[in-house]
Amino acid sequence: MRTLHVDLGERSYPIYIGENLLGDARWFAPHIVGRRVAVISNETVAPLYLETLLKALQGHEVTPVVLPDGEAYKQWETLQLIFDVLLKERHDRKTTLIALGGGVIGDMAGFAAACYQRGVNFIQVPTTLLSQVDSSVGGKTGINHPLGKNMIGAFYQPQAVVIDTASLKTLPSRELSAGLAEVIKYGFICDEPFITWLEAHMDALLALEPTVVTEAIERSCAAKARVVGADERESGVRATLNLGHTFGHAIETQQGYGVWLHGEAVGAGTVMALEMSHRLGWLSAAERDRGIRLLRRAGLPVVPPAEMTAEDFMEHMAVDKKVLDGRLRLVLLQGLGNAVVTGDFPREILDATLRTDYRALADQLGDE
């Protein structure tokens, strides 16, 4: 078992990473303040892991809240279901919420914790690779709106993050690949040697070799913890964690939430960010192609939806959270391992990026 720390002063918290942590009270008891616990999960995860988690919560009064599964349910109506149960069961301010599931559950449970009686404790128990390496760490919580992804929410830190790597054994291969988009991101934005490591270990990651998976999660969480510790509320360097996300969120919104998995959209969006960085002269063709090959080896789409036009992208990107004073800012790369957030680029470069034939670009790289 490995322990990392997110350093936020009095709001600091541990990240526990290991196999078969879910049923062990040692990782939960220190972070539960009262007698009552509400476990927020979904119809897919609860049958797999709720019973195991309950073993770690013996001695507490536990209320399970099982929600529909999927990005399409990350909305007000589903959030209200959580509040309905908490109020009906008379949970008070000493209640601890536990998010048992992927990114959707973590985001909604965290937002519910931020709002319920103006703030109660919560613990993240992420069960997908994407949530383990990204969304469970850093305190971003919220829901989607039909006009934009994650536009309604709060920064609200958990008491702890408990990552049981054994939960990945039940993860569909498509979800595993989606999570790898966020793992790869850390190499692209701040850790070029990690790219080399991922190239050498991608087959082992896809095969879920335990030591390799644990190292990938630990390196990813360590990178996220460093960034969050330096910039909790995304006023500066934390925005670099959104590499590929502005393009990716446009894909998710246009296609309908859940049609593309978040990590899939980030994968295609990252290809677009690589291409734009290349067009600006910040990334060589060899670096761009190296990045695309790694994303493709991870099983990710490297071509955005063919039916999406440049105008479609611009319409949705105009609602992005990184837009300031009406100016679109993007996360781009000045070399692999060096991300920047900038709105200082020629509009024609962005337009050319949106109109690039990504199918032809992928085809010219050939098969692995």
Curated annotation (Swiss-Prot):
It is found in: Cytoplasm. Pfam families: DHQ_synthase (PF01761), DHQS_C (PF24621). GO terms for molecular function: 3-dehydroquinate synthase activity; metal ion binding; nucleotide binding. SUPFAM superfamilies: Dehydroquinate synthase-like (SSF56796). It is an enzyme of class 4 (lyase). Keywords: Amino-acid biosynthesis, Aromatic amino acid biosynthesis, Cobalt, Cytoplasm, Lyase, Metal-binding, NAD, Nucleotide-binding, Zinc. It catalyses: 7-phospho-2-dehydro-3-deoxy-D-arabino-heptonate = 3-dehydroquinate + phosphate. Its EC number is 4.2.3.4. It comes from the Bacteria. Its cofactor is NAD(+); Co(2+); Zn(2+). Zn(2+) binds at E182, H245, H262. Binds 1 divalent metal cation per subunit. Can use either Co(2+) or Zn(2+). Catalyzes the conversion of 3-deoxy-D-arabino-heptulosonate 7-phosphate (DAHP) to dehydroquinate (DHQ). This is 3-dehydroquinate synthase. It comes from Pseudomonas aeruginosa (strain ATCC 15692 / DSM 22644 / CIP 104116 / JCM 14847 / LMG 12228 / 1C / PRS 101 / PAO1).
